[in-house]
């Protein structure tokens, strides 16, 4: 299973919070996830207050180091497929991009988003981080 996992932002954030980063190495994410993770950490620190800003900075630093050891995919040239998938599944374009990349690259989609996991399961194999810990 290792080496064929595509982590979405929700699973990346969960792995960061658990400090369980080993599974990320030599696996996949996409460059949009980098912004999604940073945005989620900013939101938790600045708007929700569930973590301090210093903790958010620390997690971003760790995440930046981990990404260096991941294979980072691009949604290009799949833009039309992504829009079509978003329309078909009634999910955001961001979520659809993970489904399309998992399908095109033959990867297992790792997501903590139950709704996405259910909607995508007929198209790609989906799992939660908890399924592989």
Name these PLM-found stretches:
Residues 14-15, 36, 81, 118-119:
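Phosphate- and divalent-cation-binding pockets in alpha/beta enzyme and binding domains
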Residues 69-108, 112-115:
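Active-site neighborhoods of divalent-metal-dependent phosphate/nucleic-acid chemistry enzymes
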Residues 16-50, 54-58, 71-73:
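PIN/NYN-family metal-dependent endoribonuclease catalytic core
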Residues 10, 35-38, 57, 80, ...:
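Non-catalytic, well-ordered alpha-helical scaffold segments
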Residues 2-4, 29-30, 99-133:
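Acidic, PIN/NYN-like endoribonuclease modules and their adjacent C-terminal/linker elements
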Residues 51-64, 115-121:
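Membrane-interacting alpha-helical segments
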Residues 1-19, 29:
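Metal-dependent nucleic-acid phosphoesterase active-site entry motif
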Residues 38-42, 64, 83-86, 99:
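Amphipathic alpha-helical segments within well-ordered protein domains
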């Amino acid at each position: 299973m290792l080496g064929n996992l595509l982590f979405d932002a929700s699973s990346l954030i969960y792995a960061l919070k658990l400090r369980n980063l080993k599974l990320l190495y030599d696996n996949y994410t996409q460059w949009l996830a980098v912004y999604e993770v940073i945005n989620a950490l900013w939101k938790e620190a600045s708007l929700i207050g569930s973590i301090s800003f210093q903790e958010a900075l620390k997690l971003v630093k760790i995440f930046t180091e981990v990404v260096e050891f991941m294979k980072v995919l691009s949604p290009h040239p799949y833009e039309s497929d992504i829009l079509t998938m978003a329309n078909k599944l009634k999910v955001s374009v961001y979520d659809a991009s993970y489904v399309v990349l998992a399908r095109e690259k033959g990867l297992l989609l790792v997501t903590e988003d139950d709704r996405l996991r259910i909607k995508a399961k007929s198209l790609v194999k989906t799992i939660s981080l908890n399924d592989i810990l």
